[in-house]
Amino acid sequence: AAVLILSGGGLTYAAENGSLAWFFDSLSRETGSVIPSKYVDESYINNEYKGSVKVITESDAKVSFDLKKVAVDGDQVNIAMVITYDDFDTEKYESFDAQMQIIEGGANIVSEYAGSTAPGDGTSLTNKQTMSDIVYKLKKKNAYKVGDVITMRCNSITLFNKNKSSDGAVTYVADEVDGPWTLQFKVQDDMQGHSVDVSGIDGIEKCTINTKGITIDIAENAAVDDDSLENIILEMTDNKELKDVVYGIGKTGDGDSIQRMELNFTKPIDVSQVKNVWIDGRKCKVK
């Protein structure tokens, strides 16, 4: 699945707006996507995670994890967090990232993910912080509900240093900070998923829409143009059409001859205002 890395440089959103507000403003700025505020689910942004997070580690590295959002929808979990690495060398490295796994019984139960990370810009987040907003697809449906405990593991922190060679080519050199860190926390919210009627489109088995994005399941051998799926239009209840609202597009198989297309919104959408989803020029009703 695709992971969009945002530069975050030069942004000046105030910290008091909240980390999620800063993150989505950063994402909108980077992608050029504009979603009118009347269609944005502001409560999803403003209701940051308030529960306790238990962290277990034997690592000496000064790394902390601050959860901002934990929400579920069937076999998907949206987890947004700020990661702070106090010993991050800003002179030597440009950015850092933490690859997280959702685990049960020591085994990874995530089959794919799509989302983005944004390094701190010195205003809303320090330059020793990174924020991620990831939708994880689980290997089993309805694994969690609000109030359930999720266990995540981060085996290491990856540090990225940009190098430019004599021919002008830019490469990224990665170093590792060893963990592992194990996090436990409760599911806070629901992404309010709805099914979308795609019975009129050959090759598409299922489509769902929730606050965070759209999921399209495609039959493995279907002749479906991927580019057409990226050109999603949301028709709202007031007949306004929203275009260019998705990013973080990822596509992988799930082992059942189905390919899943993940399309995340640049800001959380108030799904109650979405009347139809236009896919490849065809109107699909939100149920």
Predicted regions, residues:
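Alpha-helical, hydrophobic structural elements that either
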Residues: 10-287
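Hydrophobic core
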Residues: 4-6
